[in-house]
């Protein structure tokens, strides 16, 4: 059966196939979760039928090429008509498939804007995980995850739990990586992606891969599923970039339209300061500088408690940057281990992640 969400145009459907390619062979299975973008029930049924046929074809004729199979799912279907936001491959035919990679492929191919997976590495359904939850999202490259990232997480959680009606039991912390962050070399390196995923999962974190380069799009996405509190944790440089008008030229209302979508009623920014490694000067919400033309706009959000400073930080940890740690790992230099959370360096060494080579 089709399930309609609170939004009139949103209908969700689970679909899958359990199959064998040889007699007496254990079953393999492919399951999908789709979200319709069209309103007409008859059209939805026809679209679902077509995608079902494509799934059957893919299962029997493309099971050795699952990435290619994903592309076949949209044969004879308008891409704007349906979104595939979750897919899982299980069984003997797919023993070598990591479903996190297949989720990444959904975003890369434009089949969905965001996917999620849990600490156990299994894919999660965003609609279910985000529904009516308080959300704290921390964006980064996590290449690798450092003490600074973990400090941002812990301090954000501490601030949030002190807020009225925080309800920690109904809250979700998400470590978000954008598609552009995964394409630092111009193309997606799956091994590099899996290295990041393994580290974050080892720390017990829920991970989101998204195509939301702009923060306002991320905020819009969350607001589709929840009306509760949304908190975005970011560094000072990220907040300054948000006030760069070049990101909003595609919007008819420009930066004002974007900020209307970003700083809505229940959203706040938890701001982590930066330090000048040479002078030791700290920059926070009170001392950061934005374009003079936008200064009053920034002050409006600042004085309306939309930007909250993260305090009690470790100034030594603030000098740690993922890119520097990564360079040390690749060059085989010493000293990078103490810049990472407990247990992370051991995992990098044991699994030889991020190009680590034992001497």
Where are these regions (language model features)?
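Nucleotidyltransferase catalytic core that binds NTPs
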Residues: 5-359
């Amino acid at each position: 059966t089709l399930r309609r969400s609170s939004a009139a145009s949103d209908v969700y459907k689970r679909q899958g196939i359990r199959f064998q390619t040889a007699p007496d062979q254990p079953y393999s299975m492919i399951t999908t979760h789709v979200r319709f973008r069209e309103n007409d029930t008859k059209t939805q049924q026809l679209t679902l039928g077509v995608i079902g046929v494509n799934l059957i074809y893919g299962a029997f004729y493309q099971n050795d090429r699952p990435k290619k199979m994903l592309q076949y799912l949209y044969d004879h279907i308008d891409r704007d008509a349906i979104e595939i936001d979750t897919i899982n491959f299980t069984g003997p035919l797919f023993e070598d498939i990591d479903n996190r990679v297949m989720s990444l492929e959904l975003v890369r191919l434009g089949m969905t804007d965001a996917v999620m997976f849990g600490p156990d590495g299994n894919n999660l359904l965003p609609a279910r995980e985000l529904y009516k939850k308080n959300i704290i999202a921390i964006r980064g490259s996590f290449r690798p995850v450092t003490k600074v990232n973990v400090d941002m997480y812990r301090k954000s959680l501490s601030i949030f739990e002190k807020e009225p009606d925080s309800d920690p039991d109904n809250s979700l912390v998400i470590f978000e990586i954008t598609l552009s962050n995964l394409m630092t070399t111009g193309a997606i390196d799956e091994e590099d992606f899996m290295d990041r995923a393994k580290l974050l999962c080892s720390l017990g974190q829920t991970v989101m891969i998204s195509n939301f380069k702009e923060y306002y799009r991320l905020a819009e996405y969350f607001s589709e599923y929840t009306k509760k509190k949304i908190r975005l944790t970011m560094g000072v440089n990220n907040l300054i970039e948000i006030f760069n008008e070049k990101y909003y030229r595609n919007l008819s209302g420009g930066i004002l339209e974007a900020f209307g979508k970003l700083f809505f009623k229940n959203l706040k920014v938890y701001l982590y300061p930066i330090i000048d490694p040479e002078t030791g000067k700290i920059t926070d919400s009170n001392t950061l500088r934005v374009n003079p033309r936008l200064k009053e706009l920034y002050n409006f959000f600042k004085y309306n408690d939309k930007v909250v400073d993260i305090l009690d930080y470790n100034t030594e940890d603030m000098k740690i940057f993922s890119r520097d740690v990564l360079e040390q790992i690749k060059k085989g230099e010493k000293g990078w281990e103490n810049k990472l959370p407990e247990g992370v360096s051991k995992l990098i060494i044991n699994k030889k992640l991020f190009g680590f080579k034992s001497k």
